[in-house]
């Protein structure tokens, strides 16, 4: 029985001395007594290499490198005694989740949290933590009985104790956790003859749990000799740099005292690792109270960057220099980080420099396509075939890979199901997926071509194939009665899908292609799936469980799967976190992300039990738990110390001034501390260094091209650029090995967001020999020519989603009002409220099922919206009733369509316009309502347009003038041309161009006290209500028209129906009036026609410019669907914005328009 401790600071040769001793013994007696070297899991491979690579040894049968758990396996193999089934981490988590769900009604604090994502994982971690520190449910029960605690703390511990107790009962005699197996290992250790003959070394640890101390004590009692290596100066001050390993030293002394032996301490003080004064000074003086600075000799660097990407790029350049100038191998270099944002950048940046590397982290399997397929398949069943998991399942393309062009077919299928809102068993509706239903994809219905029909037939075939598989899976799972049945059904279904065969074939192909890591991932995923199924059967076997619970438990298990990737080559840069830092004796260590907040890092408790609760428990129960946050915070300097002392020749610290999210960052306080150790150690700002020495950026061809592009772009913009970049360009251009991709970069240099003007034949082939278009198409062109080109030239169509859009709402109102108007023949004035309600219900029953494939009945929200629509329609009818009673104008036509050649007698004729190229322009559309009033053989026409949005329900004459608002003038022009079809006299004149805002009225009053009187209240409410529906637009100033629009106008002075008010003398007032004389209206109509011709001419000339019209400080880009196509940029493209004179008075400006005889209907 002997306990030794090797004590020394970093780099003093403790491990080297141990390895030399072991090697010497192995050489002297290769088959002698066993030597056991215990190390952390992540260090075992490195230590094994030390023996394997020794040419005199070439391995050994005598020495074994193990971690604590593997050591227990080794002893159990010899002694036996472990009859229970060992639980994996995933099995433990699944069991605890199931227990929590079973007993959630017994919980006091956590009852409402048991379904939260990650709760069972946290609870599992807490129970494992208790086991590591030998805290049993009995400890918790006794503590709760003996102490007066806060209610929340008591309920929390009672809940944890309850599940812990159930867990212990569940596994008792049948299963065993890794912590329990170690406890059993302690009990039988004395029976091991192998251990009795062994010398045991423990290296690489800085602290131990209570359970591990118990193992060490048992080893001391049983083995010939136990030696523990500690990185400490032997100072047991709890506030020193070496607090953590010194605490271990204290525990070892207590173990020795308990066993009545002496702890033999061997001190190591001579530095062996560091090859220069800088690193020796860094190690020895880092924790010194009084610093003795020395002259800096260049072995330590501190880099400052503006961003973490710039920082990682510079580290990559430095690594290239290390391998080129210092003849380092990649395996001589390590990068240590703390901030997880760096891990992503290593993956993206280092391959650009052709630097091989291995990041020592375990990645979750969750987001791999295979795992996504499995989890989505489970979620499809859980959510009753919800569209989201269904599409995730299909888009993995694993179950559909046997289809030709499957990715394209899946995109088509997604467009269809998203537009139709396919969910639940609607996936099985063959009528819904009939080929004819594919004629409407997006907003435009069209006849299918032969090619399209064949594509959609393949889409339906693919859909049916995946549905058959899901039904097979669902049927098999529903027929299962217990967990073993579920697991068997899942596996057999995967076999039926040929998934194993597909995965193995795909893996072999990846190997052939040299993508060995991806191939290894497939192997690990399949093995992981099988392991989880085995765990389910092991833990639950024939236990009855609902399908819902099984799927939840299965998913919990899948969440635990992680990739454990073996390095693909030995010569590669090692990357790890500073906390683990298992990269001893590297020639160059890069410590990146040395920012305040990362090093030191604020430590906060993430366990269920808070730090304060831990302290109370430790004091009252006389047990030790895992360190609290304040203790861990004290160890931050030690973490930095261990990380920076891994290098033997050079250490580079780097930090950035800006984080991954653009936030400001400060350098670590340790940077100043390190600078203070040396005279002459300066921080090198990477940006300034590169400006001063541009050649320092030219370490790798790929990155040199990137920086070359940036420099040449700056040069083109007349900025100062070093001449060396022009030389670099010439060299790369003339070198066939370096100029690959250079031409592509140069085209980007002169990139300007300019489109190519189409030649007229090409424009004609796109748009046709005749333009048949709606008014909105021309308005769209005047907003931006490219918008028109993308929409009507390229015919790009945004995916339509199964939801209510603004234009859907507008269509509902239009259709419902037309239905009711036709029913009452436009006579609203005699409708009472009861009749209005009945008509509204009848209209919506006819209209709503036609909206977006019965969207309005798809869920409770849309059914509520339907009711609100009914309220709005009723309010609108009440307003129309009021307006109808007080005007001489009567509705003449509702939803009046117009085109060049009418389809029936109800439609109006639109006379073609002719472009400058002689191309006919046929305008088509639909006028919501035409009202007419006849007096003295003269008929006056009102155009009424229903708008469901407030901004669009305004007539802006400036927009009319510039062609941004062409609708109303066009409608009036069409109506004036169709007197006969409207059944009016030959002399027809414009009355009003008016918008009716269909909306849900919201009333507000400044002084609600005014509404105390009931009669007054009703009157005021009615007035306010009617004011909300006042027509807006432009009215003919002819008094015959004005008087007819509101028959009470002379009496009330200001109309609450139309935008007209009268002065006391009976003339039209300027305030509250929007009027123009008949000639002016005709000039606007003529100008509007000219805008049509001008616009159509530009279209046929092939204009496609990205040139949005900026009007009223707003761009049409704000609501444009084609920004991802045109790539409009507010900085680059601002010079292309079109502007118009917005200060004009449109009434005055329009007077310059000359009317021809045919333009005035007199």
Curated annotation (Swiss-Prot):
Gene field: addB
Main enzyme class: hydrolase
Protein name listed in UniProt: ATP-dependent helicase/deoxyribonuclease subunit B
Organism: Staphylococcus haemolyticus (strain JCSC1435)
Amino acids binding [4Fe-4S] cluster: 784, 1117, 1120, 1126
Alphabetical UniProt keywords: 4Fe-4S, ATP-binding, DNA damage, DNA repair, DNA-binding, Exonuclease, Helicase, Hydrolase, Iron, Iron-sulfur, Metal-binding, Nuclease, Nucleotide-binding
Additional facts recorded: Despite having conserved helicase domains, this subunit does not have helicase activity.
Molecular function GO labels: 4 iron, 4 sulfur cluster binding; 5'-3' exonuclease activity; ATP binding; double-stranded DNA binding; helicase activity; metal ion binding
GO biological process, one term: double-strand break repair via homologous recombination
Domain of life: Bacteria
């Amino acid at each position: 029985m002997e306990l030794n401790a090797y004590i020394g600071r970093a780099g003093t040769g403790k491990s080297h001395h141990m390895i030399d001793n072991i090697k010497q013994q192995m050489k002297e007696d290769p088959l002698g007594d066993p030597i056991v070297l215990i190390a952390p899991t992540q260090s075992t491979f490195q230590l094994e290499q030390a023996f394997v690579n020794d040419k005199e040894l070439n391995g050994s049968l005598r020495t074994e490198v193990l971690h604590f758990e593997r050591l227990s396996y080794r002893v159990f193999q010899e002694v036996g005694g472990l009859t229970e089934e060992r639980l994996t981490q995933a099995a433990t988590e699944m069991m605890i989740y199931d227990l929590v769900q079973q007993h959630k009604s017994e919980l006091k604090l956590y009852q409402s949290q048991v379904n939260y994502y990650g709760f069972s994982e946290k609870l599992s971690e807490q129970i494992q933590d208790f086991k590591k520190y030998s805290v049993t449910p009995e400890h918790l029960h006794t503590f709760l009985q003996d102490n007066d605690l806060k209610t929340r703390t008591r309920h929390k511990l009672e809940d944890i104790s309850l599940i812990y107790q159930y867990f212990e009962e569940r596994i008792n005699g049948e299963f065993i956790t890794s912590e329990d197996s170690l406890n059993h290992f302690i009990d039988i250790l004395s029976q091991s003859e192998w251990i009795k003959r062994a010398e045991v070394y423990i290296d690489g640890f800085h602290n131990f749990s209570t359970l591990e101390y118990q193992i060490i004590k048992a080893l001391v009692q049983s083995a010939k000799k136990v030696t523990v290596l500690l990185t400490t100066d032997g100072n047991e001050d709890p506030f020193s740099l070496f607090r953590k390993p010194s605490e271990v030293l204290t525990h070892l002394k207590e173990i020795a005292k308990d066993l009545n032996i002496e702890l033999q301490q061997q001190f190591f003080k001579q530095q062996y690792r560091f090859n220069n004064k800088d690193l020796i000074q860094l190690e020895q003086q880092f924790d010194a109270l009084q610093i003795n600075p020395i002259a800096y000799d260049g072995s330590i660097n501190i880099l400052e960057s503006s961003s973490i990407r710039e920082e990682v790029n510079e580290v990559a350049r430095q690594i290239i220099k290390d391998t080129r100038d210092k003849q380092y191998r990649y395996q001589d270099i390590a990068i240590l980080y703390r901030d997880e944002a760096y891990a992503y950048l290593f993956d993206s940046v280092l391959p650009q420099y052709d630097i091989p590397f291995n990041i020592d982290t375990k990645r979750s399997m969750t987001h791999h396509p295979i795992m996504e397929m499995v989890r989505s398949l489970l979620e499809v069943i859980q959510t009753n075939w919800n569209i989201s998991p269904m599409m995730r399942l299909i888009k993995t393309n694993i179950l559909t890979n046997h289809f030709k062009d499957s990715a394209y077919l899946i995109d088509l299928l997604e467009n269809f199901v998203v537009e139709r809102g396919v969910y639940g068993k609607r996936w099985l509706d063959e009528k819904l997926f009939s080929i004819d239903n594919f004629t409407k994809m997006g907003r435009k219905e069209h006849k299918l071509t032969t090619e399209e029909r064949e594509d959609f037939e393949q889409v339906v075939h693919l859909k049916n194939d995946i549905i058959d598989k899901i039904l097979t899976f669902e049927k098999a799972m529903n027929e299962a009665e217990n967990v073993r049945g579920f697991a068997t059904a899942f596996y057999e279904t995967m076999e039926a899908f040929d998934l194993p065969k597909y995965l193995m074939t795909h893996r072999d192909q990846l190997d052939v292609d040299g993508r060995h890591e991806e191939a290894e991932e497939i192997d690990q995923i399949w093995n992981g799936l099988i392991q989880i199924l085995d765990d389910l059967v092991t833990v639950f076997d024939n236990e009855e469980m609902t399908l819902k619970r099984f799927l939840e438990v299965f998913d919990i298990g899948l969440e635990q799967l992680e990739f454990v990737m073996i390095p693909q080559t030995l010569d590669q840069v090692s990357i790890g976190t500073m906390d683990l830092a298992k990269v001893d004796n590297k020639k160059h260590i890069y410590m990146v992300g040395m920012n305040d907040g990362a090093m030191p890092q604020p430590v906060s408790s993430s366990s269920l039990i808070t730090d304060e609760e831990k302290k109370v428990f430790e004091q009252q129960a006389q047990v030790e738990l895992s360190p609290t946050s304040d203790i861990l915070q004290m160890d931050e300097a030690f973490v930095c110390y261990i990380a920076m002392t891994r290098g033997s020749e050079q250490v580079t610290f780097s930090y950035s001034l800006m984080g991954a999210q653009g936030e400001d960052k400060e350098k670590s306080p340790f940077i100043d501390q390190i600078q203070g150790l040396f005279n002459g150690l300066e921080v090198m700002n990477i940006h300034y260094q590169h400006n001063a020495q541009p050649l320092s950026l030219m370490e790798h061809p790929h990155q040199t091209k990137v920086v070359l592009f940036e420099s040449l772009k700056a040069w083109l913009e007349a900025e100062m650029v070093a001449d060396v970049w022009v030389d670099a360009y010439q060299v790369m251009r003339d070198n066939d090995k370096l100029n690959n991709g250079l031409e592509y970069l140069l085209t980007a240099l002169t990139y300007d967001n300019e489109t190519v003007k189409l030649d007229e034949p090409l424009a004609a082939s796109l748009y046709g020999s005749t333009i048949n278009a709606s008014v909105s198409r021309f308005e769209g062109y005047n907003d931006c020519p490219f918008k028109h080109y993308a929409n009507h030239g390229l015919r790009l169509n945004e995916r339509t989603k199964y939801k209510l859009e603004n234009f859907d709402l507008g269509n509902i109102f239009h259709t419902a009002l037309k239905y009711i108007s036709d029913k009452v023949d436009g006579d609203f004035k005699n409708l009472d409220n009861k009749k209005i309600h009945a008509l509204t219900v009848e209209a919506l029953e006819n209209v709503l099922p036609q909206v977006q494939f019965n969207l309005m009945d798809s869920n409770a929200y849309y059914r509520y919206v339907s009711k609100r629509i009914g309220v709005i329609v009723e309010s609108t009818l009440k307003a129309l009733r009021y307006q109808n009673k007080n005007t001489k104008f009567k509705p003449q036509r509702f939803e009046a369509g117009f085109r060049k050649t009418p389809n029936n007698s109800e439609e109006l004729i639109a006379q073609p316009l002719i472009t400058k190229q002689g191309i006919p322009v046929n305008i088509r559309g639909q006028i919501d309502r035409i009202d007419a009033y006849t007096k003295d053989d003269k008929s006056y026409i009102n155009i009424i347009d229903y708008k469901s949005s407030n901004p669009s329900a305004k007539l802006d004459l400036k927009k009319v003038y510039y062609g941004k608002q062409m609708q109303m003038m066009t409608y009036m022009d069409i109506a004036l041309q169709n007197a006969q079809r409207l059944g009016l006299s030959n002399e027809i004149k414009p009355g009003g161009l008016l918008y009716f805002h269909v909306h849900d009225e919201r009333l507000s009053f400044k002084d609600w006290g005014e509404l105390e009187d009931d009669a007054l209240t009703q009157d005021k409410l009615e007035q306010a209500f009617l004011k909300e529906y006042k027509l807006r637009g432009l009215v003919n100033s002819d008094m015959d028209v004005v008087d007819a629009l509101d028959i009470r106008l002379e009496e009330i002075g200001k109309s609450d129906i139309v935008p007209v008010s009268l002065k006391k003398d009976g003339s039209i007032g300027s305030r509250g009036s929007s009027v123009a004389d008949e000639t002016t209206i005709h000039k606007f109509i003529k100008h509007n026609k000219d805008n049509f011709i001008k616009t159509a001419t530009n279209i046929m000339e092939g204009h496609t410019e990205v040139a949005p019209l900026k009007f009223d400080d707003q761009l049409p880009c704000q609501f444009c669907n084609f920004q991802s196509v045109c790539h409009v940029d507010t900085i680059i493209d601002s010079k292309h914005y079109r502007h118009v004179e917005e200060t004009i008075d449109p009434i005055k400006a329009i007077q310059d328009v000359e009317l021809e005889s045919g333009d005035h209907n007199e």
